[in-house]
């Protein structure tokens, strides 16, 4: 199939009117067409399918439930929203529950109509009790290398990101041991600039939901935010649901980190795509009202927004469209070392493609 006349996104952040060839047999982007099928994309943007590396659940289901059918329904919902690849993200739970959840990724079809599972984001239990957010305090503990090896094996070595608080005992050794096999993300942490700087020097390369569940950027104590901005290999997630982060801070984060290091995420929980009401997250009740999801004490408990809407929010907040697409596609793919496969329109990559109208509504999902 040949997609003609569309404004095709390029990794520079620009759009160019050109043809894009898809091998419909292999579902890969190709150099030459195998058939004469043509899709006229006149007036449409052509972008890669989005990649969400931090998403807990949707449509009443959560990855941590350990329910294969529920995870498959999450994958279907995400695909319908233009999110064609994702890292199901766990909560802080006992090892046996995490083991059961991680095993479910093998049961989700890698087929049309389902978002592709690119790996797992393990958020906890190696987090700070002081910055636990919606994580359950009784399950938190220091990094445990043996436990992580067991969980990695249970997942089929599919853990792509692990969030840790670098101030916890044993964090530096943990980072050094696993930095070559998984992205080490700093988050849910009270770490000072110096502690975070040492963690990045040891091999950490990612920040979990920048600004949330960490000390604010202070002019005398810049903390994780300042250390990450100073570290050229650190990439930073940011929740762009319009609730977690003020639009001005979104704009300034892109200025601080640059267009190549920002990653848009949803941090969506099970109430996403559902009616208002009471739901559950990590063993705790959560109230959803509109786009806001909170614990009963008012603590924000993940988002109720999908990544496509977060990308549209970013554009509304003043981020150029080409830059917002980059932050929702190739940057997250790069962070989990999958940028040749997903989040790109390069020849040989999966043909996960979105066609958008000028108002950024989805016209077609390939």
List the predicted regions and their residue ranges.
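Divalent metal-dependent hydrolysis catalytic cores, especially in the metallo-beta-lactamase
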Residues: 56, 72-101, 115-128, 155-167, ...
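Active-site gating loops and adjacent loop-to-helix segments of metal-dependent hydrolytic enzymes
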Residues: 76-87, 128-156, 198-210, 221, ...
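Active-site core of metal-dependent hydrolases
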Residues: 153-274
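Alpha-helical scaffold segments that flank or form the walls of functional sites
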Residues: 45, 53, 63-116, 139-154, ...
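N-terminal metal-binding scaffold of metallo-dependent hydrolase/deaminase domains
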Residues: 1-34, 364-365
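Conserved, mostly hydrophobic/aromatic
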Residues: 43, 122, 178, 207, ...
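His/Asp/Glu-enriched, well-ordered alpha-helical/loop segment
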Residues: 227-236, 242, 254-266, 271-356
């Amino acid at each position: 199939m040949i997609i003609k006349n569309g404004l095709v996104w390029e990794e520079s952040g620009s759009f160019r009117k050109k043809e894009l060839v898809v091998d419909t047999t292999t579902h890969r982007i190709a150099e030459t067409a195998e058939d004469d099928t043509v899709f006229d994309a006149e007036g449409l943007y052509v972008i890669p399918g989005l990649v969400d590396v931090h998403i807990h659940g949707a449509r009443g289901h959560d990855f941590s439930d350990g329910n294969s059918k529920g995870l498959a329904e999450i994958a279907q919902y995400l695909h319908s929203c233009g999110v064609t690849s994702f890292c199901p993200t766990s909560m802080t739970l006992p090892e046996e529950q995490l083991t059961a959840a991680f095993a479910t990724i093998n049961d989700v079809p890698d087929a049309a109509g389902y978002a592709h599972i690119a790996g797992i984001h393990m958020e906890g239990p190696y987090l700070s009790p002081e910055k636990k957010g919606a994580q359950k305090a009784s399950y938190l503990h220091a990094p445990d290398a043996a436990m992580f090896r067991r969980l990695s094996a249970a997942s089929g070595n599919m853990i792509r990101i692990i969030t840790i608080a670098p101030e916890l005992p044993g964090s530096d050794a943990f980072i050094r041991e696993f930095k070559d096999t998984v992205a080490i993300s700093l988050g849910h942490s009270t770490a000072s600039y110096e502690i975070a700087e040492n963690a990045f020097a040891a091999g950490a390369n990612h920040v979990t939901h920048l600004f949330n569940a960490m000390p604010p950027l202070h002019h005398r104590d810049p903390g994780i935010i300042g250390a990450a901005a100073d570290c050229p290999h650190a990439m930073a997630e940011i929740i762009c649901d319009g609730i977690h982060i003020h639009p001005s801070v979104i704009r300034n984060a892109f200025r601080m980190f640059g267009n190549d290091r920002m990653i848009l995420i949803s941090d969506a929980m099970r109430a996403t795509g559902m009616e208002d009401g009471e739901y559950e997250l990590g063993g705790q009740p959560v109230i959803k009202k509109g786009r806001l999801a909170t614990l009963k004490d008012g603590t924000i408990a993940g988002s109720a927004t999908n990544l496509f809407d977060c990308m549209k929010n970013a554009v509304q907040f003043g981020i150029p469209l080409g830059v917002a697409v980059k932050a929702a596609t190739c940057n997250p793919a790069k962070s989990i070392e999958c940028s040749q496969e997903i989040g790109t329109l390069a020849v040989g990559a999966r043909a996960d493609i979105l066609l958008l109208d000028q108002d950024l509504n989805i016209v077609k999902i390939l």
